[in-house]
Regions:
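Broad phosphate/nucleotide-binding scaffolds in NTP-utilizing and phosphate-metabolizing enzymes
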Residues: 1-217, 235-262, 273, 281-382
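Catalytic-loop of the protein kinase fold
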Residues: 220-230
Length: 382
């Protein structure tokens, strides 16, 4: 794949596109999903030089042991297992790919040029806003000190939420290109063999993921994780937990967060209540409040946020998705709905696009579990 060969920024772009299930056809998104796990690896020597440059010290000054082979690599960084020299604690060390300092601005410029050229030749596919969003979010994601602050904040927020099996690795210290945190590991949420071999109920995992990410969207003052995909979530067997959830949900990669205004949270929640109640006048009212969607474009927007054919939205969005519905959506995309979606979402507030991005998680939890959580949420009584 060209994005994989061209390196970090383009892999990051591909990962972002893999999660755009609210906009792109499943066939496109599925093509980009392997980029969640296929990323470049920087040499140990280059990392040693980076640490020396950034801190004035060597890796051996911080760690008594440091595994040179990374246990994981992402588009912007890779993770090594190490042992802290002063405490003996086993930790995960997230280290930015050193060449990003030099190449990131050039790659961003090329991305903007490519999307601008695409708009010129295919004006109906204007996704220049995606390059703009990447240009805004990338500097934040490249600041690991900020990521450390984000992780600490979301860890503190969820410590007050009862019965949520969420684990956020504790941050020990952070620099702009180096992040040291406690070592926490698990398996991808779609590793069904692991779940089954440890008697982890798939529906319980679904329910936990639904609670966690919907809390981020609808919870008062909750921070919103804006890069949710299967590579950033891990499930770990934990028989010590009480109740039905005999597992932990580990959430990684806290580089990109947004705060949702309370008024938007409430209007978006009321939009979903209207969808579940099949109350079309209220759906249209709150669609305009959250995204300035007019009457003409509402059916398209309703399909985008629910992932369902609009005729289903008008009846009961909780009903099982039929083969006929899947074929209808596929046919509509081929008949120009994709171009209409691109143009529509280019006008939607950016924070709404980031909220919609959580739709990527729909492959990990059943829709009826989302509904069950949603109706019981405290925000509905606010």
């Amino acid at each position: 794949m060209a994005m994989e060969k061209n390196g970090s920024i383009f892999i990051k772009l591909g990962q972002h596109m893999s999660s755009m299930t609210y906009l792109l056809p499943n066939e496109w998104c599925d093509t980009f999903i392997p980029l969640q796990d296929k990323c470049p690896v920087s040499s140990y020597e280059s990392l040693e030089k980076m640490v020396q440059k950034d801190t004035g010290q060597s890796l051996s000054d911080f760690f008594s042991e440091f595994e040179q082979r990374p246990v994981g690599a992402a588009s912007l960084a890779q993770v090594h297992i190490a042992t802290l020299k002063d405490t003996g604690e086993r930790v995960a060390v997230k280290m930015q790919h050193p060449e990003l300092d030099e190449w990131a601005p050039l790659d961003l410029g090329l991305t903007r040029f490519t999307f601008a050229a695409l708009k010129r030749f295919f004006p109906e596919y204007d996704i220049t806003w995606l390059a703009e969003e990447l240009g805004k979010s990338l500097p934040e994601e490249l600041d690991f000190a900020q990521e450390g602050r984000n992780a600490t904040r979301v860890r503190e927020y969820f410590s007050k939420i009862k019965d949520t099996p969420l684990v956020i690795p504790r941050v020990i210290w952070a620099k702009r290109r180096i992040l040291v945190m406690e070592y926490q590991t698990g398996h991808r949420p779609d590793d069904l063999a692991y779940l089954d071999s440890h008697n982890i109920d798939r529906d319980e995992v679904s329910a936990a993921l639904a609670r966690i990410f919907n809390e981020m969207i609808f919870g008062k003052n909750a921070p919103l994780h804006c890069d949710p995909h299967g590579g950033n979530i891990a499930i770990r067997h934990n028989p010590k937990r009480r109740g039905k959830a005999n597992f932990d949900v580990i959430l990684y990669d806290h580089g990109l967060y947004r705060d949702i205004p309370l008024s938007l949270r409430r209007s978006y929640a009321k939009l979903w209540l209207a969808v579940l109640d099949v109350d079309e006048p209220r759906m249209r009212k709150y669609a305009y409040e959250v995204a300035r969607i007019d009457e003409e474009h509402f059916p398209l927007f309703a399909s985008a946020i629910t992932g369902r054919d609009y005729r289903v939205v008008q009846k009961n969005v909780a009903m099982a998705r039929s083969t006929e519905e899947k074929e209808a959506i596929s046919d509509a995309l081929g008949e120009g709905m994709l171009a209409d979606l691109v143009q529509l979402l280019a006008q939607v507030p950016r924070v709404m696009l980031l909220i919609l991005k959580t739709n990527d998680l729909s492959k990990f939890f059943r829709f009826e579990l989302f509904i069950l959580w949603f109706r019981d949420s405290e925000l509905m009584n606010a």
